[in-house]
Amino acid sequence: MRVSDFNFDLPDELIARYPKTDRVSCRLLQLNGENGEIFHRTFSDVLDLIDEGDLLIFNNTRVIPARMFGRKASGGKIEVLVERMLDEHRFLAHIRSSKSPKEGAELFLGEDKLGENNGIKAVMKARHSSLFEVELSDKSTALLDVLQTIGHMPLPPYIDRPDEEADKECYQTVYSKVPGAVAAPTAGLHFDENLLEKLKAKGVNFEFVTLHVGAGTFQPVRVENIEDHVMHAEYVEVSQEVCNAIIATKKAGKRVIAVGTTSVRSIESAALSAEEFGNPDLIEPYFSDTSIFIYPGKKFRVVDCLITNFHLPESTLIMLVSAFAGYKNTMNAYKHAVQEKYRFFSYGDAMFINKNSNVRGLE
């Protein structure tokens, strides 16, 4: 399979640069993965699509204000995007500057907010491929506190505008809990507290995994054949409680519904681990990095339904959706979404998909 197989034409005006003020009012394209049928709905209709006893799996990661602006000691401007927090004072980051900082170079962060010559001092300790290991010089202040003071919400590049005060709330799920993501698990942005309460009242069960979404989620696939692509790693936590709930749901004949591709990758990583290590259970606890890459031809061991946004052309995320719903069904649904002027990407509209259990490759 070629990357170009997953391309589609998207008018620029369909890229959502601001969210809906009412989270549940976005549009919802329902796709039957078994036969390709499409229904046009509103997101609040998920209440009618999810049954009593079904299990919703959410990703409770919380987006950190991971983008910082500053300068090198030489005076050159830098933009720092935290990729992963290593401890309270060290982090891995992408750094944009005219010249990459060398090991031992001093950085002064946050001068856009703190004023010239008042930046927070940090040191570039080492380079790991495309990432820079950076350490705060002042050990009396934790990294999260620094980010809350000087950081900007790391809006995706396609939103193409500076972050605003409202993004601190809008680019965050209402159930986010564990800080560490540099991109939101965007399918969850459509749920508000009222909808969650209605789902609970209906008898729908909830469980939470944690996958700290990295900036790699926006990186293009740079190979021609998708089988040659090396997936970026992200940290995942799937607890025993989550595993027990999934097993009980399956035994009861109910559905496991993943909210977002990150929830899919978390659950399927834990299920793949169980299979590879000969665990007789369907799934086992998982606390590790995952580089799982799901594309057409790969099987799904756990997930029955998927709630997801509309993704970038030629991205690993549209490949995952194609594996889940079938390639032809997915590309046809995207064609319909463009024709019907759905809003795309992080602040855009959503899909509700039930799995095609028979797909193989580009079918």
Curated annotation (Swiss-Prot):
SUPFAM superfamilies: QueA-like (SSF111337). Pathway: tRNA modification; tRNA-queuosine biosynthesis. GO terms for biological process: queuosine biosynthetic process; tRNA wobble guanine modification. One of its GO terms (cellular component) is cytoplasm. Belongs to the QueA family. This is S-adenosylmethionine:tRNA ribosyltransferase-isomerase. Its EC number is 2.4.99.17. It is found in: Cytoplasm. It holds the Pfam family Queuosine_synth. Monomer. PANTHER family: S-ADENOSYLMETHIONINE:TRNA RIBOSYLTRANSFERASE-ISOMERASE (PTHR30307:SF0). NCBIfam families: PRK00147.1, queA. Signal peptide: none annotated. GO terms for molecular function: S-adenosylmethionine:tRNA ribosyltransferase-isomerase activity. It catalyses: 7-aminomethyl-7-carbaguanosine(34) in tRNA + S-adenosyl-L-methionine = epoxyqueuosine(34) in tRNA + adenine + L-methionine + 2 H(+). Transmembrane segments: none annotated.
